[in-house]
């Protein structure tokens, strides 16, 4: 029980955290269930096993290189049983000897001097290090120091600078790239000895311009028959053998290396050749994480549109001849598979026995693209070698070309990968892999107006002589040099493109269309379409076509739940990008820009996406009633700001922020889709001239603050949004509130317009939503005893709720704004077009927002009904 107590930490609100498994539970029963679960029990057993092994082991050095484990075992058996010996196979300078019991270890250590074959041995206890659970390790590509990331992003000048800084923090350093080049050169040198004329091509994250710290090293071993003869410009030059050996020599302390904790499926420490073969084959998933950047993310099927047509000769063959040739083809295919499997085993044997520093080698012939997985100890890299993945090589070159064509591609992809990872949208299984997410970003950039990137079909047409390539029957032709292509005329800033991406994806028909990068537009999956046109293409909840292998839906593994969650998260992110918190750097030290987007998803953020319905009443009256409910009934402190509008037809370029705080009107676009018209360059959520205004009320926002963002003349500034303004607006036309841009002329001749979306920042110092029913019942009983009836009008109901709030606050809390920080603060946003209210947390250090949001979902609709009746 003591061990369990040391693993469990109590958290606020009755929650618990298991530090061993890196798991947080909501209550004590959930904690008890976790502690009895298989994951926790396995890790407890693994920790005990590692500790026992360490207590039985000794570190041995000083023996000659030609001494093997058998000789060491024979010597140490004189002191007691030997359970295991782990040799340093690379340099042969140390070994870990695990004795059968502690008494045998003590007998070894009690011997003052040890010698073997005339050489003195240095024997000392194995260093004991704190057990590190595999669950507590940082995900690949995530900076271990989150504080450094937060600080760097907070100090950036704007959102675009934050995105560029994120790339700098996550991309490989020059030293890491050189190390990978050395490993590739080492592989090239070794494989050339066995396969003269072969070429080792790196692909995936290493060369597609979207590398991150710790990404896998994916290699394609080309045995020949390449369509293009010139060498890969990204392939490293092979240095001399001596320089390779010295460059890859490990500088790690062997004692520390041997004591480094491993995952539950790893061996004790750096294993010998025999141990790597015997220990690792049971656990194919543990060897090296699959690289999503390669085209191996999901299963592929045969192409519908792009399958080569059946020739007339084949159609005229007789059935008997067809059957005979089918049998011959099956036999030939079987022979080819057996031959490929034999070559794969040969490659694995070469890696095991001939490449210094390589261990945990495993052949995986059953994969869609058969590979040999390996680990390289001196560099710490995981990787795989494939023999038939030339298409992925061109996919990587295509991604690299896209990043070279426009400097905004890399920051946008890095930011969205990080956002998806922190929101649990990318990864293995049913989640989006990085390759699919990158293609989704490229598709989005193809659909801008004007486009940021050309379509694949346009790139194919611009391929020059010598760049026409066909791989596995697919056209992979595109220019190699981005400087030959005309730059995009789209000059939108990164912050605007990021906001547009969220708006675009949240409105896409992911299941009813096929997003085609070759065409740069969605191909509608209409009902009644002949099945033979789609034969081989695996349609699903999300359909994203590979740029070259048109039979491959790179998002075929994504489930309906994940696709729906992707669009939900994009919708919430799009709403956030319309706020000043995204657009402006905080002067009060609060998170701004990218930082809230990159925070892990929480119950608060998920709840903020749930909408609260508003009654179908004139919007100015609804706004006024909402203010009364928040301020009078609940005692919220609402900090006011300025209401502003922009001139009609204002373009994105008029604002340094690209107008991302506007809400778009998409009626015209939706109509065009209903009529069956193509919208090849458009995407729902894009900026257009037909936009409606959004009014935002921000904390302590002054006209001077707005002048920094607004390019219009000062006389466009409108008065504060107060109850008097709302009263006048309602009196002006109580039954038909006007949308911005549709105003009428008042007595002064100036246009009177009403916003279509209003936001408030609210702060609470007391938990006025808890115990409210009990307090109301008590006050109603007092009113009844005094001979007064219950509330019959909206004003009486509001007065009663204000008394309930005061009762919950206590007798000594009559100040509108008490001193000190509020208990929590939130943003309430009302939308006229959607007739909904969105509530999102701003500051919630105690985790109280979920309870408040649950209360508001039932309280707000009933309160507005009472006030507006």
Curated annotation (Swiss-Prot):
Keywords of the record, alphabetical order, are: ATP-binding, Magnesium, Manganese, Metal-binding, mRNA processing, Nucleotide-binding, Nucleotidyltransferase, Nucleus, Phosphoprotein, RNA-binding, Transferase, Zinc, Zinc-finger
- Is Ion transport found in the keyword set? no
Q: Which residues span the membrane?
A: none
Zn finger residue spans: Matrin-type: 16-46
Q: Which CDD domains match?
A: NT_PAP_TUTase (cd05402), RRM_TUT1 (cd12279)
Cofactor requirements of the protein: Mg(2+); Mn(2+)
Q: Where does ATP bind?
A: 205, 395
Protein family membership: Belongs to the DNA polymerase type-B-like family.
Domain comment from the record reads as follows: The zinc-finger domain is required for terminal uridylyltransferase activity. Together with the RRM domain, binds the 5'-area of U6 snRNA. The RRM domain is required for terminal uridylyltransferase activity. Together with the zinc-finger domain, binds the 5'-area of U6 snRNA.
What's this protein's name? Speckle targeted PIP5K1A-regulated poly(A) polymerase
Traced from the root, the source organism's taxonomic lineage reads: Eukaryota, Metazoa, Chordata, Craniata, Vertebrata
Gene symbol here is Tut1
